Amino acid sequence: MPMTGFYETISPRDQQRPPIWFLRQVGRYIPQYQELKRNRSLKDFFLDTESIVEATLLGPSLLGVDAAIVFADILSILEGFSVDYRFAPGPEVSYSPHEPLIFTKDPQETFSFLLEAIQQLTKRLTVPLIAFAASPFTLASYLIEGGASRDYPKTIAFLYQYPDRFKALLDEITLGTATYLQMQVQAGAAAIQLFESSSLRLPPHLFAKYVVAPNTKLIRQIKQTGNPPISLFCRCFYQEFLSLYAIGADTLHPDYHVELPEVYRQIHSPGSIQGNFDPALLLLPQDALIAHLEAYLAPLKQQSHYIFNLGHGILPQTPIENVQAVVSCLTSISTS
């Protein structure tokens, strides 16, 4: 059963409303972000301390959210694995999955740009800072596919043809990811968000093997150092979501395929849940958006340890005014 540490870490004090933050809350939809990035390459931007700091600060300053999330990419960890990658503009990865994936022996040096950014952010922020990384299956899918994919054909074929090597790859990713996140917490991050965004492709009989088991192992390893609160975002359907209750996360964050009212009806003590408003609704005219938001929130108002977020990241074409309107609406709605 999920605990409540993540909720308590980011919950606004003395306010009877759910905590608020967004997946991909800083990105191309924000004009100030576009100005920060200008003509620089995305990879250079992700590897620059000052850029990470200034971009991360945009979330709380422009949106009024209750948490900041480190501005990085799920491929940033590949710096520690010495795997070549770039954005052209989408992610492209050069790696053979038959090769052992070995994490750097000096992660403090390899990720000094990131750790310095976190240290600076903790001094400047008035809200908690969240570190994040891809979960093992999702990062493995990027490595095998050579980038983003819709149907993950290479990944599915590889795990069937080379099951032992695929399991070893997940173990290698788990080991490096645990170190990557532990040192961010040691640098000052208050909580961790894991992203299992490729998991919707897996049929049920593979979900337990390649999502539940690796995430359980990863969370256990992370919590050996400092026991930081952890939330897991996972793209899945209802039955697969229920199986995530065994992994040891503090908060579970389903995508928009899971109906939260159904979760609360079926599970007596569901713990802390985060999500899962459809980001496509942020494209609607504001009056329609707010109507959908209020309908979405109505069955959740009496639920404890609920965190408002999206069922996926904010879309690039989203008007920033709509995101701000959502925050304004939420801060005015009592959950008492």
Swiss-Prot record:
Site (Transition state stabilizer): 73
Pathway: Porphyrin-containing compound metabolism; protoporphyrin-IX biosynthesis; coproporphyrinogen-III from 5-aminolevulinate: step 4/4
Record's catalysed reaction(s): uroporphyrinogen III + 4 H(+) = coproporphyrinogen III + 4 CO2
Compartments reported by the entry: Cytoplasm
Ligand binding (substrate): 24-28, 73, 142, 197, 312
Gene3D superfamilies, per the entry: 3.20.20.210
Major localisation: cytoplasm
Cellular component aspect of the GO annotation: cytosol
GO MF annotation terms: uroporphyrinogen decarboxylase activity
EC number: 4.1.1.37
InterPro entries: UROD/MetE-like_sf, Uroporphyrinogen_deCO2ase_HemE, Uroporphyrinogen_deCOase
Keyword set, alphabetical order: Cytoplasm, Decarboxylase, Lyase, Porphyrin biosynthesis
GO biological process, one term: heme biosynthetic process
Biological role: Catalyzes the decarboxylation of four acetate groups of uroporphyrinogen-III to yield coproporphyrinogen-III.
Subunit structure: Homodimer.
Family the entry assigns: Belongs to the uroporphyrinogen decarboxylase family.
Protein's name in the database: Uroporphyrinogen decarboxylase
Taxonomy of the source species: Bacteria, Pseudomonadati, Chlamydiota, Chlamydiia, Chlamydiales
